[in-house]
């Protein structure tokens, strides 16, 4: 468990950094995340080796980011992606990817881990927001998964 939690945290760091670079530079965040991941793997700068699950998360979020962001925009009542704290955006992207696109993670674990990251790293209101939004998507997950399967995603 601790290994996956560390992998999520590192993926969050990469997704957050890529998102911030995209905001300041105008480049698409998903491509930046994969490029940043490749850069960190190639030149680790004294960091521990990249965990396999970190790579899987970053690549998975990047591959499905358009759909993930569409779902977040649709179900985050009153919140646009741009209005969300950047850390929450990255946490939610990981959570949605784990819920809908990664069969290896139990749904409850995906939500719990996202809420734990929000509690540790974001605002006081973030855990409730993340829990509520992912909880709503969790209730819709069977239908959303069927839609993804039908669309070939």
Curated annotation (Swiss-Prot):
Gene3D superfamilies: NusB-like. It comes from Beutenbergia cavernae (strain ATCC BAA-8 / DSM 12333 / CCUG 43141 / JCM 11478 / NBRC 16432 / NCIMB 13614 / HKI 0122). Involved in transcription antitermination. Required for transcription of ribosomal RNA (rRNA) genes. Binds specifically to the boxA antiterminator sequence of the ribosomal RNA (rrn) operons. One of its GO terms (biological process) is DNA-templated transcription termination. Pfam families: NusB. One of its GO terms (molecular function) is RNA binding. Belongs to the NusB family. The keyword Transcription regulation applies. This is Transcription antitermination protein NusB. InterPro entries: NusB-like_sf (IPR035926), NusB_fam (IPR011605), NusB_RsmB_TIM44 (IPR006027). It comes from the Bacteria.
């Amino acid at each position: 468990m601790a290994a996956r939690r560390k992998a999520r945290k590192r993926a969050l760091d990469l997704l957050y950094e890529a998102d911030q670079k995209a905001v300041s530079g105008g480049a698409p965040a998903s491509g930046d995340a994969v490029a940043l991941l490749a850069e960190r793997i190639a030149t680790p700068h004294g960091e521990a080796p990249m965990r396999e699950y970190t790579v899987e998360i970053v690549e998975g979020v990047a591959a499905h980011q358009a759909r993930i962001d569409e779902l977040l925009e649709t179900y985050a009542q009153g919140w646009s992606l741009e209005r969300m704290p950047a850390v929450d955006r990255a946490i939610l992207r990981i959570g949605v990817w784990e819920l809908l696109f990664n069969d290896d993670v139990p749904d409850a674990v995906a939500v719990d881990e996202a809420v734990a990251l929000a509690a540790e790293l974001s605002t006081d209101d973030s855990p409730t927001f993340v829990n509520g939004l992912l909880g709503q998507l969790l209730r819709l997950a069977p239908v959303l998964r069927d839609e993804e399967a039908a669309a070939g995603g």
